[in-house]
Amino acid sequence: MTSFADLTTIGVGGPIATFLEPTTRVGVIEAVEEADSQGLPLCVIGGGSNMLVADTPFDGVVVRDARHAVSVLDEAAPVENGETIVHVNAEAGCNWDDFVDYCVNLGLEGVEGLSGIPGTVGASVVQNIGAYGQEVASSVESVEVWDRKNKQTKELTNQELHFGYRMSALKASMYSAPATPAADFFPTPRYVVLSVTFALHHSETG
């Protein structure tokens, strides 16, 4: 039986009743839907680097997104300062540092200052990770989510994500207040991240 100790970087946490690691977008949605339909506690995790879990059994479902594809979507028209914006999409389960390396190798700027932060792409926008005065919010175009309340996928824009210091509308939706929108979802938010689209630009150094 899988335990949280197997999934967290700190190596502690009790056994998990059901552990799922879907490899498709549909699989992620179905795993979440199944847990919600049965009224089971649901915990969707990323890299397990920001978790301290009790050693008592977790009688619910833990989902870890095993998808990690990254793709360049397009190149938009030049913005006002003359730079060309490049849209890059990454699936939620992609390791954050692997994503940063991918972008740097393509000569793209916007997330390189956040290299070395543990976790996944999906978790990065929930937490609005940051370092050295930079936050992931500054490079996010939109986030595709599964809305557990309305049972549908949804595209949330940067503005709709209400990013703040280590906070987002995604994270806030775990709590009854002061969530935007308010909902009782815990320990996983109302919105489960499926993929993130970033707006990056070409590096001047190539």
Whereabouts are the PLM-identified features?
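Anion-binding (especially nucleotide phosphate/pyrophosphate-binding) glycine-rich loop
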Residues: 1-149
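FAD-binding subdomain of flavoenzyme oxidoreductases
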Residues: 113-114, 124-206
